C-alpha cells in the first residue's frame, strides 16, 4: 500500500497496514461469549479508529467500508430480534441484496383446484391449475444520526493535551456516538416490526366485512337484490361485532366464539415452508394474533386456553436470486442458516475457530441427509393459545416496540359514532300510550304529568351521569333566522313542472260595491266552477302514514314547518279580480303564523288536546253546570230568533243595551226558566254587558253565575298567554305578548265587529307592517259616530262604518272617533270568538249578515196595548191587555216572535225598542284586512307575504241552524257569510240562492269562504284549526286550552318565549350528536402469509455545519402469499371515550350566517336569548371575513364537548324508526340501493314520488328534512352553505350533503364489490393483491357515514323509565303513557358503565 503524503498528520505505511488489518477482521475478540456484544463492540471500535485515522483525509475514500460495516451491523441485529417477535409467524423473511435494483418484481403462483368425483349424469372433471400473478411492493426504512465537530476532533485526537480531562472528554464522545448509533440501529429493528404490522393491517379487512362475505354464496357481479341482502347482514355484524371484548367482558364463552370466527374466516397461505414456528412439542403455529397489552392480558386471564409458554422460532432467513430482468424466480427456498454461529460465519466472515466461542443450539440428533438441511430453531418465551382448532401466537407490540417512541400504535385507533335521539315526539295513536300498571311511576298530584307531551330527552354521558336535553336547547337552531330562509326554496319549486290546480283557497279577490248578500249569492253560484277538483288543503283527515306516502301530492310542498307552499296564479297582485286570471301557475309561500296551522297529520288532534290538558293544569275550568247550559244553548235548534234580532239591533252598543235592559232581562230570565239555557252567549259584547248590568239580582243566581263563569274562563285563558310569555321590551312597537300569541296582536281582528275599536287599534299598531283594510271594495274606511232615523241609508255602498254612540261623552260633529273600550276588551273578545265559541259549537256556527232594511221595520211592528194610567200593567199573557195575548198576536208583528219563543215580556219592555232608533245600523259590511309579518318574522323574503283576514261589521254569529224556522230558512233577516273555517257550517248555507244538494255536499268538505273575505293559505285561521275543532273528542275545558295552544305564533322570536316557558311548540326534533372513541383492535394473520424482502443497507453522509450527518436507508419489499384474505382485523375493545357524550347544544348564531331580519334589534335579541345559559357566550359581530368566535367557558370537565344538532320533524313521527339505526334525514340514502342509471342517486335521496327504500310504505319520515330545499336540507346540506354546514363542526353534514353521501356510498359499493370479488374464485389473468378493500378504514373509523345511518343510544323522555331500563328489569316497558324509552341499539351497548 503506497504512502499518502499530506501537509499535516502524515500517515506512515506501518499505520496504514494496521488500519487495513482492522478492516480485514470484521469482528473483534472479546471474551464475553456473546456474539452480539462482540459485533457491537467491534463495530464501534472500528468506527472510532476510522474517524481518528482519516480526519485529515477525504471521507468519501472510506465510505464503502463504512457502509458495509453499518449494513452488516444493522442487518444482524435487526433480524436476530425481529424473528423472536410473533409477527415473524406471519411472514417469511428473505435476504435480497439486489432489491434496490428491482423495478417491477413479479411472482407467479400455481394453485391446484380441488376436485370431487361424483356419480350420476355429471360431466367428468379434470384437474384445474390456476396461476396467479402478484407484484412486489417496494418500501424502505430510513434513519439518521449526526456527529458534532467537537466530537470528531476528540475522536480523531486532533487536539490532544494528554490530560485526564482530555481523556474523559474523548471517552464521553465515544459513548455518546455509541448511544446514537445503537439508537439508530435499534430504530431499524422497531421499524421492521412497525412496517410489517402496517403491511398486515393493509391487507386485513374488518371481521364484520369478511365474515358475511365468506357466507355469501353468489359469485361475480352483485345485483341490487344481492347487494341489499349483503348490506343488511353487514350492518348487523358491524353493530354486533364492534367492541365485543368490552361488551362481553363477563362472558368469556362469547369472546371465544368471536375469536374463533375471526381465525376461521381467513385463507391459509400457499407457501409450505421449512422455516416455521412450533410449540415445544413440535406442533406448528397456525397464525399470530396481535393486539394491545391490555387485551392480551384479558385474553390470558381465563378467556383463551394457554397451550405453551415458549416457542421454537427459526433464527434464519432465506436469500433471493435474480434471473432475467427483474423476475423473482426463487422465493424463500434459499440457503438455510443454522443458529448464531452460522450468522457470524456466513454474514460476518468470522472464520477463526478461536473466536467462535458462542453458545449455540445443539444440532438435531438425526443426521440423516433428509434432515441435515433443516434450519435450526431457538426457543424463546411466547404465549401460544388455542383459538378454535388453531394454535395461535398471541403477541402485543405496544410496549416491546412502540413504548416511548412517539409513534402511535396502529392497533390503537379512533372511531366516530353518530347518535340519534328523538325529542318532543308524541305518539299519536292512543293505543301506543299505555301503562301496564296504574301505580307505575305514580306522582303526588292528581294529574299525572307523564300524560303530557314530552319536552326533553334523558341519557347518560361518558361518566354515566344522567344528562338531559330539552326543547329549550333547540333555541339556537329553531330560533335562528334560517327558519325564515325560503327564497331559494321558492326558486327551486318554481323551476319544476307545475300543473294548473284548484285556486280556491289560495286566491284573494277584491270585493265589490254590491250589497253583501248579492256578493254572497254570486259567489255561491260560481263556487263549484272555481274548483275543478277538491283542493289539497282540505285533506286534514289523513293519517301520518297517508300524508307521507308517495301518492300524496301535497307532500312535495311540505318543506318547512313555518310556511305553506302552494300553486297559485303567477304575476297577480292580491287582492285580484273576482275570477282568477288565466295566468301561468307559480309557487307561492305564506307564513303559517301560528302552530295550529301545521297540518293535522303532522300535528295530530291527540297531541293538541294533550297539550291543552297540560296548559289547563291548575288553571280555571268551567263548572259542569256552565258547560251543560252553554252546550245546550249552542245545540238548541229552537233558539229564539228574536234573540238574534235583538242582538242585531243592539249591534254591540252599550247605550243600546242599557236602553233595552228591561226587555233583555225578561228574555234571558224567561229562556233560562223554560230550558235552563243561557241567551246571547254567541256575542262577547252581550256577555260583558250582562255580567256588568244584570248581576245584581236581576237574573237568577245560577243563571248569572254561568255568564260569570264563562267570562272568568276567558280571563283565565288570557292569563295563560301572559304566563307563557317572557315579559320584556317588545320590538318595533309590538309587545312581547303580541309577538308570542296571535290573539294579542292588534293586527288580527275578531270575526264580528260591532264598532271601530279594533280598526283604530290596528291602525295604531306597527306601521312597518303596512296594515291595510278594504271595505266594500274600497281601500280604507270612514267612521261615523251614529246615524238615526233621519240619516240612515240602508242602500249604502261606500266604505262608511258606523262606530256607535258612546255611553258617555259628546258625539257632535267634529269630535274625533275614539274607541269605546280598551285593548284588553278586544283581546278578550278574540279569545271568546276564536276559542270559547268554537269549543262549544264544534263547527255548527256560521257568521251571518243582517238585512237591517227588513229588521228595523219588523221592530216597528210591535203591538203594545194602551193601558190607562190608573190601572196596573198586566203580568200574564192571559190578560187581554198583555202584548202577548192571543188578540195581540197579529201576523208579522214582533209580538209573534216573543210568543213563538215562549217568552213573557211586558209592554214597558217592548216600548224600549223605540230607543234604538237613535243609533241604528245600516248594513252588514264585509271587511278584508291585511298586514305584513310582525317584527319577529320580517325578512326581505317574508315582508311581502301578507295575511288576509275577513270579518263582518254589524254581523252576528248564528248557533245551531234552525231548519224549521221559516224566518231563518228563507233568509228573511239573516243570510250566511262565512268568514273563516271556524264559522262556516254548511247547514246554514241552505238559505242562499242556488244552494243545490251537490253544493251542500261540497260545503261539508270544503269551507265556502268567499275570496273577497280571504283564502285558506292567506288567512290566519286555516283548515287545520277548524278540523281540530270539529273532530276533537276532548271535553270543553281541555278544548279551550287546546285551541289557545294552537294560537301561539310560530316565528323565531315567539319560539324564544315558548321554549323558555315550557310550552311545546308543536314540532319535535331529531337530536344528532357525534362522539369519538379510542379503540383497541385485534389483528390475526395466517402463518407464512406474507413474504418480506430485505435489501442491502445504504449509508449516505454529508458534511454539515457543526458536524457530519449520516442517513441509513434499507430497501424493503413484500408480497402477499395467499389466494384469499390471509389476515383479518376487528375493533375488539373500547379504550375510552374522547368526547363527553354530553348535551352541548348547537347555536347557529355562532356557526353560520342567516337571512337578515328587517329589524336589527330582533337579531341581537335572538342572539342574546339563545346564548343565555349556554356554554357559549355571545360576541360582538366581527368583520365579514372573520368568523364568529364565541368566548368559551373558563374550564372543562369531561373532555371535548360533542355538539348536539337539531333537525325539526313532525311531532307525530313514528318512534319505531328511532329504535334501530336510521338516517337523520328520515329517508334512506345511498348509491348502494340504486340501479345502473346515474340519476338514481338523486331519486333515492330526493324523489319522494318513490317510496323510501328502507320503508316502502312511506316516502319519508320527515318531509321537513329529506326533501330537496326543505328546511333541514337547506340548514345542513353543505352544497348551499359557504359558511354554514361544516364537515368538522356539523355531525349532520355527512348525512345531508349529496357529495358526501355519494362519496360514502360509492365507497361502500366498492367495498362490497371488491370484497366479494376477491372472496370468489380467482381467474388466471388477474393480479389480486388481496388488500383490504377501499372503505375498510371508513368502516372501522366512521361506520355511520359509510352506512348513512346513526345509532340510537339508551335514552328516554322520562328519567324514571331510564333508570328502570338500565337496571335490567325483565320486560321493562318502552312506553308509559306519553313517555317513551329508546333502548341502546348502538355498538356501545353494554360497553360504558351505568350508575347502579
From Swiss-Prot:
The keyword Mitochondrion does not apply. It is found in: Virion; Host nucleus. Its main location: virion. Keywords: Capsid protein, Host nucleus, T=16 icosahedral capsid protein, Virion. GO terms for molecular function: structural molecule activity. The keyword Methyltransferase does not apply. GO terms for cellular component: host cell nucleus; T=16 icosahedral viral capsid. InterPro entries: Herpes_MCP, Herpes_MCP_upper_sf. Belongs to the herpesviridae major capsid protein family. Homomultimer. Makes the hexons and eleven out of twelve pentons. Interacts with triplex proteins 1/TRX1 and 2/TRX2; adjacent capsomers are linked together in groups of three by triplexes, heterotrimeric complexes composed of one molecule of TRX1 and two molecules of TRX2. Interacts with scaffold protein; this interaction allows efficient MCP transport to the host nucleus. Interacts with capsid vertex component 2/CVC2. Interacts with the small capsomere-interacting protein/SCP. Self-assembles to form an icosahedral capsid with a T=16 symmetry, about 200 nm in diameter, and consisting of 150 hexons and 12 pentons (total of 162 capsomers). Hexons form the edges and faces of the capsid and are each composed of six MCP molecules. In contrast, one penton is found at each of the 12 vertices. Eleven of the pentons are MCP pentamers, while the last vertex is occupied by the portal complex. This is Major capsid protein. The lineage of its organism: Viruses, Duplodnaviria, Heunggongvirae, Peploviricota, Herviviricetes. The gene is MCP.
Amino acid at each position: 500500500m503506497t504512502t499518502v503524503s499530506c501537509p499535516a498528520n502524515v500517515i506512515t505505511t506501518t499505520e496504514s497496514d494496521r488500519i487495513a488489518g482492522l478492516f480485514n477482521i470484521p469482528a473483534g475478540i472479546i471474551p464475553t461469549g456473546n456474539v452480539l456484544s462482540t459485533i457491537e463492540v467491534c463495530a464501534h471500535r472500528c468506527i472510532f479508529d476510522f474517524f481518528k485515522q482519516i480526519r485529515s483525509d477525504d471521507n468519501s475514500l472510506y465510505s464503502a467500508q463504512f457502509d458495509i460495516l453499518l449494513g452488516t451491523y444493522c442487518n444482524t441485529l435487526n433480524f436476530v430480534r425481529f424473528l423472536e417477535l410473533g409477527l415473524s409467524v406471519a411472514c417469511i423473511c428473505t435476504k435480497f441484496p439486489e432489491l434496490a435494483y428491482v423495478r417491477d418484481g413479479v411472482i407467479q403462483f400455481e394453485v391446484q383446484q380441488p376436485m370431487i368425483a361424483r356419480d350420476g349424469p355429471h360431466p367428468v372433471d379434470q384437474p384445474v391449475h390456476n396461476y396467479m400473478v402478484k407484484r412486489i411492493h417496494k418500501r424502505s426504512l430510513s434513519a439518521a444520526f449526526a456527529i458534532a465537530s467537537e466530537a470528531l476532533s476528540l475522536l480523531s485526537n486532533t487536539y490532544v493535551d494528554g490530560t485526564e480531562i482530555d481523556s474523559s472528554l474523548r471517552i464521553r464522545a465515544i459513548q455518546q456516538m455509541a448511544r446514537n448509533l445503537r439508537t439508530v440501529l435499534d430504530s431499524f429493528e422497531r421499524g421492521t416490526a412497525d412496517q410489517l404490522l402496517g403491511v398486515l393491517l393493509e391487507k386485513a379487512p374488518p371481521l364484520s366485512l369478511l365474515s358475511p362475505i365468506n357466507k355469501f354464496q353468489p359469485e361475480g357481479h352483485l345485483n341490487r337484490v344481492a347487494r341489499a341482502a349483503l348490506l343488511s347482514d353487514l350492518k348487523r355484524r358491524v353493530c354486533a361485532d364492534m367492541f365485543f371484548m368490552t361488551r362481553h367482558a363477563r362472558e368469556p364463552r362469547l369472546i371465544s366464539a368471536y375469536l374463533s370466527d375471526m381465525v376461521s374466516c381467513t385463507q391459509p397461505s400457499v407457501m409450505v415452508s421449512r422455516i416455521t414456528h412450533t410449540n415445544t412439542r413440535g406442533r406448528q403455529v397456525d397464525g399470530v394474533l396481535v393486539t394491545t397489552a391490555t387485551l392480551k392480558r384479558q385474553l390470558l386471564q381465563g378467556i383463551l386456553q394457554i397451550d405453551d409458554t415458549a416457542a421454537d422460532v427459526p433464527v434464519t432467513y432465506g436469500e433471493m436470486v435474480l434471473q432475467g430482468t427483474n423476475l423473482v424466480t426463487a422465493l424463500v427456498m434459499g440457503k438455510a442458516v443454522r443458529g448464531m454461529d452460522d450468522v457470524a460465519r456466513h454474514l460476518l466472515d468470522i472464520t477463526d475457530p478461536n473466536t467462535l466461542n458462542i453458545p449455540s443450539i445443539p444440532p438435531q440428533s438425526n443426521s440423516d441427509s433428509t434432515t441435515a438441511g433443516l434450519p435450526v430453531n431457538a426457543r424463546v418465551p411466547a404465549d401460544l393459545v388455542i383459538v378454535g382448532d388453531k394454535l395461535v401466537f398471541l403477541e402485543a407490540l405496544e410496549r416491546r416496540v412502540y413504548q416511548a417512541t412517539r409513534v402511535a400504535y396502529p392497533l390503537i385507533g379512533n372511531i366516530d359514532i353518530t347518535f340519534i335521539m328523538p325529542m318532543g315526539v308524541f305518539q299519536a295513536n292512543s293505543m301506543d300510550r299505555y301503562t301496564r300498571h296504574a301505580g307505575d311511576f305514580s306522582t303526588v298530584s292528581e294529574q299525572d304529568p307523564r300524560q303530557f307531551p314530552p319536552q326533553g330527552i334523558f341519557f347518560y354521558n361518558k361518566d354515566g351521569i344522567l344528562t338531559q336535553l330539552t326543547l329549550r336547547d333547540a333555541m339556537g337552531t329553531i330560533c335562528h333566522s334560517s327558519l325564515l330562509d325560503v327564497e331559494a326554496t321558492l326558486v327551486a319549486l318554481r323551476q319544476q313542472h307545475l300543473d294548473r290546480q284548484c285556486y280556491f283557497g289560495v286566491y284573494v279577490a277584491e270585493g265589490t260595491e254590491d250589497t253583501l248578500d248579492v256578493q254572497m249569492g254570486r259567489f255561491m253560484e260560481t263556487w263549484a266552477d272555481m274548483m275543478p277538483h277538491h283542493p289539497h288543503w282540505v285533506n286534514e283527515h289523513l293519517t301520518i302514514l297517508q300524508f307521507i306516502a308517495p301518492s300524496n301530492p301535497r307532500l312535495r310542498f311540505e318543506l318547512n314547518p313555518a310556511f305553506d307552499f302552494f300553486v297559485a296564479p303567477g304575476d297577480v297582485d292580491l287582492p285580484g279580480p273576482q275570477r282568477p286570471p288565466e295566468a301561468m301557475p307559480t309557487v307561492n309561500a305564506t307564513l303559517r303564523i301560528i302552530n295550529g296551522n301545521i297540518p293535522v297529520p303532522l300535528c295530530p288532534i291527540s297531541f293538541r288536546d294533550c297539550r291543552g290538558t297540560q296548559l289547563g293544569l291548575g288553571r280555571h275550568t268551567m263548572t259542569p253546570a256552565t258547560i251543560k247550559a252553554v252546550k245546550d244553548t249552542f245545540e238548541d235548534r229552537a233558539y229564539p230568533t228574536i234573540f238574534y234580532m235583538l242582538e242585531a239591533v243592539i249591534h254591540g252598543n252599550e247605550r243600546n243595551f242599557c236602553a233595552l235592559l228591561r226587555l233583555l232581562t225578561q228574555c234571558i230570565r224567561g229562556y233560562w226558566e223554560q230550558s235552563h239555557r243561557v241567551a246571547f252567549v254567541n256575542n262577547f259584547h252581550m256577555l260583558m254587558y250582562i255580567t256588568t248590568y244584570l248581576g245584581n239580582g236581576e237574573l237568577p243566581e245560577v243563571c248569572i253565575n254561568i255568564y260569570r263563569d264563562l267570562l272568568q274562563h276567558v280571563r283565565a285563558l288570557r292569563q295563560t298567554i301572559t304566563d307563557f310569555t317572557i315579559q320584556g321590551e317588545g320590538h318595533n312597537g309590538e309587545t312581547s305578548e303580541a309577538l308570542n300569541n296571535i290573539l294579542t296582536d292588534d293586527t288580527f281582528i275578531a270575526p264580528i265587529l260591532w264598532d271601530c275599536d279594533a280598526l283604530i287599534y290596528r291602525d295604531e299598531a306597527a306601521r312597518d307592517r303596512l296594515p291595510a283594510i278594504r271595505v266594500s271594495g274600497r281601500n280604507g274606511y270612514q267612521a261615523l259616530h251614529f246615524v238615526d232615523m233621519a240619516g240612515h241609508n240602508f242602500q249604502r255602498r261606500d266604505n262608511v262604518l258606523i262606530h256607535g254612540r258612546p255611553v258617555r261623552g259628546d258625539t257632535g260633529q267634529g269630535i274625533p272617533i275614539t274607541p269605546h273600550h280598551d285593548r284588553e276588551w278586544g283581546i278578550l273578545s278574540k279569545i271568546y270568538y276564536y276559542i270559547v265559541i268554537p269549543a262549544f259549537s264544534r263547527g255548527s256556527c256560521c257568521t251571518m249578515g243582517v238585512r237591517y232594511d227588513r229588521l228595523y221595520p219588523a221592530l216597528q211592528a210591535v203591538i203594545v196595548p194602551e193601558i190607562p194610567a190608573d190601572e196596573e200593567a198586566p203580568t200574564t199573557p192571559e190578560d187581554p191587555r198583555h202584548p202577548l195575548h192571543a188578540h195581540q198576536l197579529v201576523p208579522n208583528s214582533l209580538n209573534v216572535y216573543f210568543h213563538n219563543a215562549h217568552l213573557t215580556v211586558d209592554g214597558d219592555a217592548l216600548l224600549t225598542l223605540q230607543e234604538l232608533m237613535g243609533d241604528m245600523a245600516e248594513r252588514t259590511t264585509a271587511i278584508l284586512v291585511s298586514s305584513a309579518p310582525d317584527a319577529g318574522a320580517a325578512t326581505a323574503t317574508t315582508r311581502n307575504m301578507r295575511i288576509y283576514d275577513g270579518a263582518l261589521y254589524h254581523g252576528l254569529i248564528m248557533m245551531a241552524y234552525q231548519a224549521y224556522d221559516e224566518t231563518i230558512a228563507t233568509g228573511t233577516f239573516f243570510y250566511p257569510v262565512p268568514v273563516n273555517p271556524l264559522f262556516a257550517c254548511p247547514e246554514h248555507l241552505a238559505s242562499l240562492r242556488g244552494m243545490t244538494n251537490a253544493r251542500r255536499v261540497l260545503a261539508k268538505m270544503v269551507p265556502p269562504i268567499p275570496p273577497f273575505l280571504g283564502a285558506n293559505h292567506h288567512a290566519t285561521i286555516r283548515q287545520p284549526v277548524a278540523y281540530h275543532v270539529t273532530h276533537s273528542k276532548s271535553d270543553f275545558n281541555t278544548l279551550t286550552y287546546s285551541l289557545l295552544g294552537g294560537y301561539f305564533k310560530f316565528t323565531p322570536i315567539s319560539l324564544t318565549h315558548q321554549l323558555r316557558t315550557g310550552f311545546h311548540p308543536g314540532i319535535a326534533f331529531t337530536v344528532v350528536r357525534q362522539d369519538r372513541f379510542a379503540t383497541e383492535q385485534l389483528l390475526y394473520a395466517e402463518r407464512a402469509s406474507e413474504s418480506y424482502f430485505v435489501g442491502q443497507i445504504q449509508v449516505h453522509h454529508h458534511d454539515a455545519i457543526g458536524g457530519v450527518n449520516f442517513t441509513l436507508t434499507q430497501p424493503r419489499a413484500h408480497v402477499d402469499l395467499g389466494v384469499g384474505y390471509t389476515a383479518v382485523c376487528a375493533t375488539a375493545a373500547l379504550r375510552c371515550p374522547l368526547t363527553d357524550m354530553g348535551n352541548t347544544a348547537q347555536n347557529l348564531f355562532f356557526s353560520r350566517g342567516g337571512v337578515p331580519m328587517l329589524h336589527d334589534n330582533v337579531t341581537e335579541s335572538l342572539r342574546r336569548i339563545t346564548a343565555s345559559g349556554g356554554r357559549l357566550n355571545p360576541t360582538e359581530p366581527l368583520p365579514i371575513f372573520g368568523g364568529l368566535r364565541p368566548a368559551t367557558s373558563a374550564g372543562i370537565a369531561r373532555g371535548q364537548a360533542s355538539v348536539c344538532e337539531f333537525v325539526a320533524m313532525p311531532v307525530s313521527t313514528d318512534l319505531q324508526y328511532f329504535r334501530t339505526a336510521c338516517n337523520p334525514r328520515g329517508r334512506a340514502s345511498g348509491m348502494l340501493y340504486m340501479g345502473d342509471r346515474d340519476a338514481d342517486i338523486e331519486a333515492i335521496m330526493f324523489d319522494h314520488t318513490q317510496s323510501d327504500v328502507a320503508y316502502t310504505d312511506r316516502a319519508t319520515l320527515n318531509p321537513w328534512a329529506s326533501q330537496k330545499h326543505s328546511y333541514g336540507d337547506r340548514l345542513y346540506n353543505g352544497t348551499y352553505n359557504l359558511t354554514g354546514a361544516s364537515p368538522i363542526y356539523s355531525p349532520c353534514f355527512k348525512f345531508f350533503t349529496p357529495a358526501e353521501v355519494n362519496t360514502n356510498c360509492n365507497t361502500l359499493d366498492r367495498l362490497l364489490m371488491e370484497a366479494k370479488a376477491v372472496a370468489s374464485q380467482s381467474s388466471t389473468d388477474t393480479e389480486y393483491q388481496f388488500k383490504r378493500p377501499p372503505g375498510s378504514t371508513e368502516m372501522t373509523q366512521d361506520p355511520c357515514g359509510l352506512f348513512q345511518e346513526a345509532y340510537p343510544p339508551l335514552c328516554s323522555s322520562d328519567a324514571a323509565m331510564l333508570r328502570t331500563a338500565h337496571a335490567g328489569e325483565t320486560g321493562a316497558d318502552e312506553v308509559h303513557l306519553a313517555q317513551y324509552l329508546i333502548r341502546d341499539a348502538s355498538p356501545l351497548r353494554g360497553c360504558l358503565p351505568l350508575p347502579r
